[in-house]
C-alpha cells in the first residue's frame, strides 16, 4: 500500500511512535494515565515481524513517545512483554507535530530525511523502508 522509499543504501535510523503506531491506542484510552502500570500493550498486526525485518537489515530502531520520563521503567517492561524490539527509547516528546531536519549529503542522491504519517492503529506492516 505504501510506496517504497528510495534513499541511500546504508542502514537507516527509523524513528517510530509507540501508541497508535506500533501498538493499539485504545488500551490507553480505556485505562487512563492514572492506571498506566495496568496497561496491557497489544502490538498491531505485523508490528513484530516488521521490527525484526528492519533490525535484520541493520537499521537503528528508535522509539518515541509522549509518555513522561517517569513512565520509562513500566514502558520498557510493556515493550518487552509485547515483544517490541528497539535500540533506543526517547520519552516525553509531547503530543504536538514532530519535525525531522537533516542535511542533504553533497556526494549522494536522494533524501536524507523522510516522514511517513499513518492513520492511528493501522500499524507499520505495509511500510517499506
Could you say what each language-model-derived stretch is?
Residues 7-129:
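HAD-like aspartate-dependent phosphatase fold
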Residues 1-7:
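Short, Lys/Arg-enriched N-terminal segments with co-localized hydrophobic residues
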Amino acid at each position: 500500500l505504501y510506496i517504497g522509499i528510495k534513499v541511500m543504501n546504508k542502514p537507516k535510523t527509523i524513528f517510530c511512535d509507540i501508541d497508535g503506531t506500533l501498538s493499539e491506542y485504545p488500551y490507553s484510552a480505556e485505562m487512563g494515565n492514572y492506571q498506566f502500570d495496568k496497561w496491557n500493550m497489544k502490538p498491531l498486526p505485523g508490528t513484530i515481524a516488521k521490527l525484526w525485518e528492519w533490525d535484520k537489515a541493520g537499521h537503528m530502531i528508535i522509539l518515541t513517545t509522549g509518555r513522561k520520563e517517569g513512565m520509562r521503567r513500566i514502558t520498557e517492561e510493556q515493550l518487552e512483554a509485547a515483544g517490541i524490539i528497539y535500540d533506543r527509547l526517547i520519552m516525553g516528546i509531547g503530543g504536538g507535530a514532530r519535525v525531522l531536519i537533516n542535511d542533504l549529503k553533497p556526494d549522494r542522491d536522494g533524501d536524507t530525511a523522510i516522514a511517513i504519517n499513518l492513520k492511528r492503529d493501522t500499524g507499520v506492516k505495509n511500510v517499506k523502508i
